[in-house]
Each structure stands twice: as structure tokens, then as C-alpha cells.
Amino acid sequence: MKLKQIELKNFRNYEDLKLDFHPNLNIFLGQNAQGKTNILEAIHFLALTRSHRTSHDKELICWSGQEMKVSGLVEKAHATVPLEVQLSSKGRIAKANHLKENRLADYIGQLKILMFAPENLELVKGSPATRRRFMDIELGQIHAVYLYDSMRYNRALKERNAYLKFDQAKIDKNFLTVLDEQLAEHGNKIMFERKTFIEKLEIHAKKIHEQLTHGLETLKITYNQNVKTDFSKELLSRQDHDIFRHQTTVGPHRDDLQFFINEINVADFGSQGQQRTVALSIKLAEIDLIFEETGEYPILLLDDVMSELDNHRQLDLIETSLGKTQTFITTTTLDHLKNLPENLSIFHVTDGTIEKEKE
């Protein structure tokens, strides 16, 4: 899978931009606040119809416009697929092969991506919500049915929580049980998919982490499932408690992950270097896992992370990704990038203007 071309209309600081990409490596070079990250954000938006930087869609639209559009050409094994995502006051529209996709579950996965940015350290040391979002994004790209179940679960959860906010005397437990059944139906599928995904991810990540640490450290990933027994029974047993709390207190929306090195919790006791190595191991593991599950390698987006890694980790990242994935890197300098291949494209970014260096 390769992204051959991208076109932006009123996206961030780009009113009208069209870029053709190298199938191997693309580097965006420039000082901070010039628009480098916006390119990677646009690729992320094209793939997932969402930004990784903001939840406020209005921030994505150029100040001079009322709507924006990101389109691209994705080269797959047997076809080149045009993709397009439009955003306006009326909402978003996603198209594949010029046809509107009514369900996001049918669109997401057309362009598979892996984003590695400084904030990815939050996967290890951040909030449980960050780790749940990580599972949802990666599983949504691999299995469309997971995204469908996740959306249905969140809809049912929102409805149940809204009902729990009613006056206690007005709550009908028979109706609440109906909502419980809807929640359990999709929640059980989500938990099964998450458990399977983490088990497979751990196999790849453990092997990579041992290589990165020369066998000195053993990585373990634990999926802390909030539901301990039968989801339906737990919902039923907690009805009175949930009515009192006005919220649903059990379910996959409260799941979490933990990471251990040699049986030590990395979030609590690991050094920053160890946390970085764990995050890197997970990202590298995802490359092979996504290929294993879908038959396609994802596109790798590296947003200003090379300067965060020492030469050893840089080399591991480049050697593991190149040859498998099309890679996009943003950086302020090439000084810290070692052993770059010759077949690449370098784009110079200055105040929203992008010039491609002659190859």
C-alpha cells in the first residue's frame, strides 16, 4: 500500500496544495510552525476522517474557507483507489472510488496508517482513555466489524447513561435491562477483539523489544479487562449502583493496558528511555501485525520523533520500516538522521510553501 498523491483544499494553512510522493521515503524538512505536521495530519485525516491533534473540526479549515477537502490516490496490489474526505458545516463526507461511503466502517481501512509522534509516549504513561483509543484506532483499521461494534456500543452507552440521569423514581428497570442487553451484545465482541489483538501484538512487540535491548529486557503487555465475569450479569447486578451514580460503571469503556519490563511497571517505575523503547517496540510490532491480519503494510508517519531517539533506535526504526512501509518523516534538520537510503524525496517547508528537492 502506497500513497501516491495528496491534494489539500483549505486544510489548515494550505489553501490549495498537490503533492506527489516517493513510494519509499518522504522527508518534510523545515523549522517549527511552518506546516510540516499539517501534511502528516492531512494523511491521518484522509485515512481515519479524524485529526490526531484536535477534536475540533473547525480548526482544520483554513481561515479563508467555509469547507475543506483532502483527497489522495492510494496504490494497492491490484488497483489505484482514489479517496476523498470533505468537511463543512453540514458534516463530513467520505468517498472511495468516487462513491460516498454511508458508514465510516466501510471507509476506514482503505488507507492504513501508523502514526508515531512524541505524544505516543502517552500510550505508556498517559491516561487509560489514551490506551483505549489506541486499541480502537488500530483494530478499526484491521477489522471493519470492530469499528461497527465500537460505534454501536458507544451509541448504546450514551443512551444508557442518559437514561441513568433520570429521576430514580422514573427509571423502569425492565427498559434498563433492554439497554443492558444492547450494551452487552456489542461490548462482548469488543472485549474479545481487544484481547485477541493484544495477545498477537505482544508476541511481535516482545520479540522486537528483546532485539532493541540486546536481550536484557523482556516486555509484557497486560490487557486489563474491566468486565471480570459475565457482562450481562455484571450490568444487571450494578443497576442500583449505576442508578445512584448516574453512569455506567462497568464495561469495555473502562478497559486499560499495562506494560511491564522484567515484571516492573514501565509507567510507574520505568525511565523515559525505557518508555520510549516500549512505545517504539509497539509501533514496529504493529507494522508486521497489520500485514499479518490484512495482507497490506500500513503507511508510517513519523512526526518529529527522530530527534527524540538516539542513533541506535533511529537505525532500528529505519531498518525495520523501510522496505516494508512507505514512510513520511517531519524534521527540522537532517543532521540526526543517519543511514538514509538514496531513493527518497525531500520536501522543504517554509511558511506553508513546499518545494520538492530535485532527486
Curated annotation (Swiss-Prot):
GO cellular component entries: cytoplasm
Gene Ontology BP terms: DNA replication; DNA synthesis involved in DNA repair; double-strand break repair; SOS response
Residues reported to bind ATP: 30-37
Highest taxon of the lineage: Bacteria
Keywords recorded for this protein, A-Z: ATP-binding, Cytoplasm, DNA damage, DNA repair, DNA replication, DNA-binding, Nucleotide-binding, SOS response
The keyword DNA repair is assigned to this record: yes
Location within or outside the cell: Cytoplasm
InterPro entries associated with the record: DNA-binding_RecF, DNA-binding_RecF_CS, P-loop_NTPase, RecF/RecN/SMC_N, RecF_2
One annotated GO molecular function: ATP binding
Biological role stated in the UniProt entry: The RecF protein is involved in DNA metabolism; it is required for DNA replication and normal SOS inducibility. RecF binds preferentially to single-stranded, linear DNA. It also seems to bind ATP.
Family of this protein: Belongs to the RecF family.
Stored HAMAP family: RecF
Protein name: DNA replication and repair protein RecF
Gene: recF
